[in-house]
């Protein structure tokens, strides 16, 4: 699929298909992975050459990419490199069909092993992600209320179950809040209760204290997103020179 004009988006009679080199899809991971990699590469080049173009991607098999020699953790990381984007964010957003409430979750870290997460977290990263999350949340509310999940169970329980929250996270959040007085933030919160108000807002009552949540790692954020907003959430990459989205999968 090459492109769709907005006027023909509802019921298109004709679609323009981009003709690129065929690939014989099979169970051979190197063949299939190589094809999907170069299809995405070609799509990125097309979007960069067109004014106001956007990109929608489907799922890939990360192992197939690796087997074919393309060693990227995911499409987000390849997109960032291709666009020379130094600071991108993986955000999941959905609108409740019941209440109309907007559900936003941003990941501080993305496709890395769980044991590597603490090594990647620091004050500068949290500042950057809160900037991204607040800017996105402002599209729907002028003075958003953000929640930040802790890294450890019960947000470390005052150092008993982990030191990151008391060692630097609390102070980092305080400093960011002082620089952004129009944004209300809450955290680091116990991760097991951070998304409770999201579930309520999705089903019954819109929350005025939950306009965005910052998760520390992939599964911490994606599990509640998929449980609460399955089949409705969309992944969007913040920080690219164009809009890129992907159905949550």
Q: Where are the regions that the model predicts?
A:
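Anion-binding alpha/beta catalytic cores of soluble intermediary-metabolism enzymes, centered on
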Residues: 1-249
